[in-house]
A protein has these predicted regions:
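Generic structural signal for well-ordered, non-transmembrane alpha-helical segments
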Residues: 55, 95-105, 129-143
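A short, Lys/Arg-rich alpha-helix, primarily the initiator
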Residues: 1-19
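DNA major-groove recognition helix of helix-turn-helix/homeodomain DNA-binding modules
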Residues: 52-70
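Acidic, glycine-anchored loop motifs typical of Ca2+
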Residues: 86-89, 106, 112-128
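DNA major-groove recognition helix of helix-turn-helix
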Residues: 31, 42-43, 53, 61
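Short, charged recognition helix plus adjacent turn
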Residues: 70-99, 152-169
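Short alpha-helical DNA-recognition segment
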Residues: 19-41
């Protein structure tokens, strides 16, 4: 690898390449379809990457989180609808999931009361929003677990064939 950059505020694509200890030239060879000049412009935020480039980087840099980062922060549709997922340790993911599920268990009867008549009355809105937010936290935790699993697979920590055997049954 060439010299390591001492630049501050490196973007996620710059950090992903550097974590692989690749120069832009070597990264370009690995990525096959992205020239070094384009990599530099993406890393220096002079150019927005295309979605297909993100897919290639995520695969070749072994960073599935790059797809979520792109969707949540750079795609105009994703910025509105896709929450950014932060990679966490499995124990933290599980504890957050259990906390949210326990909270929802307590709120389940209230959700039934609110939705029984098919409409949300004024005095039900606050509880409904709280429940909706808790469900969103569960959804984010599920996505975090999925992303964690993908990362473990690409890094060889989970046997991909065995994982897919059970996932696809």
């Amino acid at each position: 690898m060439g010299r390591v950059s001492n630049k501050e505020n490196k973007n996620v694509y710059f950090e992903a390449r550097e974590s692989m200890k690749l120069s832009r030239e070597k990264a370009s060879e690995l990525l096959e379809s992205i020239p070094p000049e384009r990599i530099e412009r993406i890393e220096n935020e002079k150019l927005m990457p295309h979605p297909d480039e993100i897919l290639i980087m995520a695969e070749k840099y072994k960073r599935p989180d790059l797809c979520n980062f792109y969707c949540a922060n750079q795609c105009s549709i994703g910025k509105q609808y896709v929450p950014e997922i932060k990679i966490k340790e499995l124990s933290q993911i599980v504890l957050e999931m259990l906390a949210s599920l326990n909270s929802m268990q307590k709120r389940k009867d209230r959700l039934i009361e609110i939705s029984a008549d098919g409409q949300i009355d004024r005095d039900e809105i606050e509880d409904f929003i709280f429940i909706q937010e808790e469900l969103e936290r569960i959804s984010i935790t599920v996505e975090t677990l999925r992303l964690w699993s993908e990362k473990m697979i690409v890094n060889g920590m989970i046997d991909e064939a065995e994982y897919m055997k059970y996932k696809n049954r």
